[in-house]
UniProtKB/Swiss-Prot annotation:
The gene is ALDOA. It comes from Pan troglodytes. It is an enzyme of class 4 (lyase). GO terms for biological process: fructose 1,6-bisphosphate metabolic process; glycolytic process; protein homotetramerization. GO terms for molecular function: fructose-bisphosphate aldolase activity. This is Fructose-bisphosphate aldolase A. CDD domains: FBP_aldolase_I_a (cd00948).
Length: 364
């Protein structure tokens, strides 16, 4: 076995570990506001609003300037490249706004999925070229963590061994480059909820994918204490006719994680994967109440499940700003409780909060 050549100094390791711990402190989680220009277009279109740079800026500002009740709930905020360089009405750059509320700035660094030729519609993720230079610049511009999304699909013959291995290696290479630049990498191997598979099949695939990811991270000498994982919860496929309880989903999810994710990993920040806002909170709560030993923080990194009601309430109208922020605060508070296993659904969730946010073959 070759000798280990140290990739990071003790100081670098401490910085990475400290950032990761801040993001997943008890009761805290991440707002994923890193939709690409194409993805945010779909959100704005759903409320009849034009996809202009100013509308995108105003909407992100609405989320970032919500009142101080969100401060103990949302610490990490993942931004898209454009948003990192936008400013609030008062002239402050968005990273400054986030930091003034005690938050940590994150940046989406992947460049989207591309087809893996010779597979049944499977993909890998591009964006490694020039990543080191971009990370160095992002660090200077105030970002302390990053996100990279890979996508896998459950089908009769998918995910293939090739897709699993390729995506695991891409995530590991990305993680290595981030850590060299003082940025905490969030690895996101998303298994899409598309399909009619049951809970057991999703659990099996999730275990195989995560095992491959952590083997690759080990091969690439990643410092696990300075990383976070952003996985899907283990849920049945969207077209599965059998219904499963929140407790069954929690047990399957925690079991899969316990079998594959080393305890050295600081935290697990779940994606919401098209669940309704309310469902995402209830399942997160059930996961935290699951009666198995859980060595990592288990919290949220939600996009649609923090924003859907707020987006509807805003409706593209400036005069609805406060109403929209109120909806966002509600979801932030709900998820802050859920990641501590303390959330009790009131049964009064608005229509928007109970609405499925599933999008077939979701591109980000």
């Amino acid at each position: 076995m070759p000798y280990q050549y140290p990739a990071l100094t003790p100081e670098q390791k401490k910085e990475l570990s400290d950032i990761a711990h801040r993001i997943v402190a008890p009761g805290k989680g991440i707002l994923a506001a890193d939709e690409s220009t194409g993805s945010i277009a779909k959100r704005l279109q759903s409320i009849g609003t034009e996809n202009t740079e100013e509308n995108r800026r105003f909407y992100r500002q609405l989320l970032l300037t919500a009142d101080d009740r969100v401060n103990p709930c949302i610490v990490g905020v993942i931004l898209f490249h454009e948003t990192l360089y936008q400013k609030a009405d008062d002239g402050r750059p968005f990273p400054q706004v986030i930091k003034s509320k005690g938050g940590v700035v994150g940046i989406k660094v992947d460049k989207g999925v591309v087809p893996l030729a010779g597979t049944n519609g499977e993909t890998t993720t591009q964006g490694l070229d020039g990543l080191s230079e971009r990370c160095a610049q992002y660090k200077k511009d105030g970002a302390d963590f990053a996100k990279w999304r890979c996508v896998l699909k459950i089908g009769e013959h998918t995910p293939s061994a090739l897709a699993i291995m390729e995506n695991a290696n891409v995530l590991a290479r990305y993680a290595s480059i981030c850590q060299q630049n003082g940025i905490v990498p969030i690895a996101e191997p998303e298994i899409l909820p598309d399909g009619d598979h049951d809970l057991k099949r999703c659990q099996y695939v999730t275990e195989k994918v995560l095992a491959a990811v952590y083997k690759a991270l080990s091969d690439h000498h990643i410092y696990l204490e300075g990383t976070l994982l952003k996985p899907n919860m283990v849920t049945p496929g969207h077209a599965c006719t059998q219904k499963f309880s929140h407790e069954e989903i929690a047990m399957a999810t925690v079991t899969a994680l316990r079998r594959t994710v080393p305890p050295a990993v600081t935290g697990i920040t779940f994606l919401s994967g098209g669940q309704s806002e309310e469902e995402a909170s209830i399942n997160l709560n059930a996961i935290n109440k699951c009666p198995l030993l859980k060595p990592w923080a288990l919290t949220f990194s939600y996009g649609r499940a923090l924003q859907a009601s707020a987006l509807k309430a805003w409706g593209g109208k400036k005069e609805n700003l406060k109403a929209a922020q109120e909806e966002y605060v509600k979801r932030a508070l709900a998820n802050s409780l859920a990641c501590q296993g303390k959330y009790t659904p009131s049964g009064q969730a608005g229509a928007a909060a109970s609405e499925s946010l599933f999008v077939s073959n979701h591109a980000y």
